[in-house]
Amino acid sequence: MMFATKRGTRDVYGETLAELGHQDPSIVVLTADLAGSTKTSIFAAEHPDRFYNMGVAEANMIGTAAGFALSGFRPFVSTFAMFATGKAWEQIRQVVAYPKTPVRIVATHAGLTVGEDGASHQMLEDIGNMRVLPNMSIIAPSDAIEAAGAIRFVAAYDDGPVYVRLARAPFPVIHDEGHTFEFGKAEILAQGTDVTIAACGLMVSVALEAHEVLAGDGIAAEVVNVSSIKPLDRETLLTSARKTGVVVTAEEHQIVNGLGSAICELLSEELPTLVVRVGVDDRFGQSGNADALLAHYGLDVDGLIAATKHALSKANG
């Protein structure tokens, strides 16, 4: 399967946020000296009176955003995922998650595909850092169209904090323009009966390509887009696992405490099922271009196909 268009989720974030700024005067945007890289510079150009550059002071940015939220505003905070969920974690826990303050944390440059910046900037633990926090919701859009829908959703969502995970590198657009994002819902993108591939972020497009190749080998893989990681769509995932009996998870994240762990927790309690997790296995990232890094860590189409066949081999004894 070849996708005609690639777009960066951070690019559509900046455009959508600026558009929403014209519709909702309560939206304010804060960044930690990275407006250009996070594309919040687009909002800043159109709404300079509601844009705040907090400098390289991420914890202060989170605290200020919480204050805005408690004063009736709808704050978005943006920086790289490494800094948003690493440097600012304590502040997120204390003044955002604990009091259930509706702050929208939209982090860019998540995962391996930061590329040449290397391990210091490749945040592979952010889903885990956010998933462990009570009251925190997590969205990892599968493409630019879903990212735009997710941003529109969180702009109007006032029932607690949300973490939205975006990437630096452009990746395939898999949805049509009319796609509607549904919070808390997983999406069956390809039907199958032999194995379930549950993926998030850019790994969804990889899963769809793997689905086509596996079909040629006589393997019917069901592809599930799990863009809402917390809350998890238990019903859809359980139904798919019950149908196929084997699950492969795919994420551009550590396999510990990410999407794979969340699905393992669900299945171990409700429907014991063989799960093979595809992701970064207890390693740090390294410098390199995006495609080379994905291949090196087994997150390309070939790697996912191999993992899927391995899962089926284990399941069949």
Identify the meaning behind each predicted range:
Residues 1-165, 170, 180, ...:
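Thiamine diphosphate
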